[in-house]
């Protein structure tokens, strides 16, 4: 339960106005630091919800598939350039960001991950690195400004951030194929 | 069959003590390390005397040549040689001998390092590479200086890969067991070295064609940023090497136990994951970065203080428990029960005490405003003589008193112990004078990286003189310390009486909790480290490359 408390503290910290203002002032930090931290805050708070609503999770997320699909939908939604713009200009969308990333992406991700089969996990690794790779190409190669609120150079920076993220996920996936943890157990 | 053979080898090794071939490898590294320390120390003395205005250096060996050689030899070469020698001995002891292939890699790495040192030192002596150990462009050294650096980095890589191979092979032979803590430190330190060296490798590969004249200009800010992703990390690698001795050997020497295996491993993981972006605070007054970015980086830099504070907590817990076991009473009674007259404890203990002001000074420098006050002053030099020159180096010295007798099957005599205590005190007092004076005169404005000058008898500059005398006195004491230490090392190596010295490895507490499995998941931690590095560096690097100025032609300022 300590974890849940830490998650809550992180969650509140991230929503403090000076913190959001600073995090959202740089495009790459907005998408690659603030948003993942919201997901992490949600993951930390997951044990609290699992304890409070055990039936909800066992009934609706017995094999982890619904949860991971929900996670993917939320993540994909927040990757669209337009949603970032709207989060900055429309308060309701900003609130939706604060709610959706921790509770509709972080919580289902942690609840689902242990329940998933290796095959499904591999699909997630591959699709996430492929999507991130595509986003990298989009943000680096686009000659136009994709977000009204951020300059083209920031857009390119974000694209390079995506290159690294895609590489991280892909390298991790590859090492799971080659390094069999059970060999060391 | 192979596994059986290895198990038998391992058992024989444990009962017979050190493997002679492994010992020869480590002793070769350590001998060269202390020869390098002697040369580097002598250069340091010359510098200190020059800085105080007491010694005029000849034209053919000027202050900046000596400064560059002193920095490269002590910050890069001495420490690297010590680290590889010490960790290879640790692997040999805790994993039951080095694999023949790994031992060979150790020798190859040694060859690469020596080649690198020859290139670097020759160009410095020829007066073609007075660029200091940070080799900032647009100052341009001879291309062979940079090629020497490539050899040095290649030596680090080969030795690191050797460590990984040995550790992985042990894990396969010992399923379900955790890698022994000291080897775990070795793996962590080399993972960090490899991650940290990526940036500097990219930098040097840009500098070489520029130094040959194949490219006309160089991106100065990009080079500095790539350098510090390495420079800061490598200092923390040396610190991690020293810390490994604190965690694993010091508790045994004081008759205590390992306080928490999990905490020690967590410190290694955090050091690896958080370290590389910390380098940015060395550039806190560089132009070309926005204030917001610098502010973000303050957090990344300060996060490194977290594992250091955990270490402080761990060590105090070990001391208190060991003291209470020996019957200490009251809040601080354990303090008196520590073996102050044992140099194997005294040297690392003073190293740890020095890290209290050293770490605090580091935290101060990480802050933008405070950094502005001291950035290009001698304060910074004082700071890294405390962290590296005291905390790290005194721990390395402390290790020598048991590692060399262990490797040579000899024993430390009470005479050497006494001499060691004198050496430690001389070093501590010398550093107190030198580093203390550097800190103080730095705040008064005396610049770093500058040979002695009174700026045309300017009153302010003349006001620095008394402090610079203290600097010279400290420097002289430190050179005395170097002479004593080199004598001790070679005495222990060749003249100490034959006998048996144990490799001190602390046992866990009787009621120790089980170390969780996640500590062994290096695949995950390396990925997290890469993610954190990209969080720290993607924004500034893309900006520096896409919005690059025209670039700078080379300058030879000496």
Whereabouts are the PLM-identified features?
Chain A
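Alpha-helical membrane segments of multi-pass proteins
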Residues: 1-185
């Amino acid at each position: 339960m300590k974890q849940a408390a830490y998650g809550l503290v992180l969650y509140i910290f991230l929503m403090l106005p000076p913190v959001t203002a600073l995090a959202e002032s740089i495009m790459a930090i907005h998408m690659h630091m603030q948003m993942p931290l919201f997901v992490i805050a949600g993951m930390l708070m997951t044990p609290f919800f699992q304890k409070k609503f055990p039936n909800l999770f066992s009934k609706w997320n017995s094999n982890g598939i619904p949860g991971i699909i929900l996670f993917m939908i939320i993540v994909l939604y927040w990757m669209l350039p337009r949603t970032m713009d709207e989060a900055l200009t429309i308060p309701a969308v900003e609130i939706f960001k604060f709610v959706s990333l921790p509770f509709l992406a972080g919580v289902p991700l942690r609840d689902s991950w242990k329940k998933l089969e290796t095959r499904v996990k591999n699909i997630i690794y591959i699709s996430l690195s492929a999507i991130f790779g595509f986003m990298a190409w989009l943000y680096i190669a686009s000659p136009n400004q994709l977000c009204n609120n951020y300059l083209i150079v920031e857009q390119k920076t974000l694209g390079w951030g995506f290159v690294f993220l895609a590489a991280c996920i892909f390298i991790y996936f590859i090492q799971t194929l080659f390094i069999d943890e059970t060999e060391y157990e | 069959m192979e596994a059986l053979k290895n198990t038998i080898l391992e058992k024989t090794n444990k009962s017979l003590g050190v493997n002679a071939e492994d010992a020869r490898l480590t002793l070769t590294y350590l001998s060269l390390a202390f020869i390098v320390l002697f040369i580097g120390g002598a250069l340091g003395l010359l510098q200190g005397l020059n800085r105080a205005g007491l010694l005029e250096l000849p034209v053919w060996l000027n202050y900046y040549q000596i400064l560059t050689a002193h920095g490269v030899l002590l910050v890069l070469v001495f420490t690297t040689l010590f680290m590889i020698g010490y960790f290879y001995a640790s692997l040999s002891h805790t994993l039951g001998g080095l694999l023949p292939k790994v031992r060979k890699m150790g020798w190859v790495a040694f060859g690469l390092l020596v080649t690198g040192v020859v290139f670097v030192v020759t160009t410095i002596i020829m007066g073609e590479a007075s660029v200091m150990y940070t080799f900032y462009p647009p100052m341009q050294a001879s291309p062979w200086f940079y090629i020497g650096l490539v050899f040095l980095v290649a030596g680090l890589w080969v030795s690191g890969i050797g460590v990984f191979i040995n550790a992985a092979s042990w894990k396969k032979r010992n399923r379900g067991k955790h890698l022994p803590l000291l080897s775990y430190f070795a793996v962590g330190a080399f993972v960090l070295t490899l991650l940290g060296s990526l940036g500097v490798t990219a930098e040097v590969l840009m500098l070489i064609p520029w130094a040959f004249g194949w490219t006309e200009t160089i991106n100065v800010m990009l080079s500095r940023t790539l350098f510090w992703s390495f420079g800061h990390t490598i200092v923390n690698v040396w610190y991690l090497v020293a810390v490994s001795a604190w965690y694993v050997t010091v508790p045994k020497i004081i008759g205590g136990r390992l306080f928490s295996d999990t905490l020690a491993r967590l410190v290694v993981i955090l050091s690896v994951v958080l370290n590389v972006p910390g380098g940015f605070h060395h550039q806190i007054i560089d132009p070309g970065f926005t204030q917001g970015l610098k502010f973000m980086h303050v957090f990344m830099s300060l996060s490194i203080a977290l594992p250091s504070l955990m270490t402080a907590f761990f060590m105090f817990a070990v001391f208190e428990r060991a003291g209470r076991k020996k019957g200490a009473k009251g809040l601080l009674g354990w303090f008196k029960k520590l073996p102050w007259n044992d140099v194997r404890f005294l040297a690392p203990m003073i190293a740890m005490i020095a890290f209290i002001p050293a770490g605090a000074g580091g935290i101060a420098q990480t802050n933008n405003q405070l950094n502005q006050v001291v950035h290009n002053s001698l304060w910074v030099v004082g700071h890294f003589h405390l962290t590296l020159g005291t905390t790290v180096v005194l721990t390395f010295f402390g290790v020598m008193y048991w590692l060399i007798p262990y490797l040579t099957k000899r024993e430390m005599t009470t005479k050497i112990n006494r001499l060691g205590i004198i050496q430690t005190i001389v070093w501590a007092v010398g550093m107190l004078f030198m580093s203390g004076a550097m800190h103080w005169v730095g705040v008064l404005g005396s610049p770093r990286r500058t040979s002695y000058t009174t700026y045309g008898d300017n009153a302010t500059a003349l006001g620095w003189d008394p402090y610079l005398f203290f600097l010279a006195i400290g420097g002289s004491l430190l050179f005395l310390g170097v002479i004593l230490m080199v004598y001790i090392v070679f005495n222990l190596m060749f003249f100490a009486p034959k006998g048996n010295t144990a490799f001190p490895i602390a046992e866990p507490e009787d009621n120790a909790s089980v170390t969780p499995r996640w500590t062994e998941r290096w695949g995950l931690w390396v990925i997290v480290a890469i993610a954190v590095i990209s969080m720290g560096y993607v924004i500034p690097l893309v900006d520096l490359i896409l919005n690059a100025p025209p670039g700078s032609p080379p300058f030879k300022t000496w």
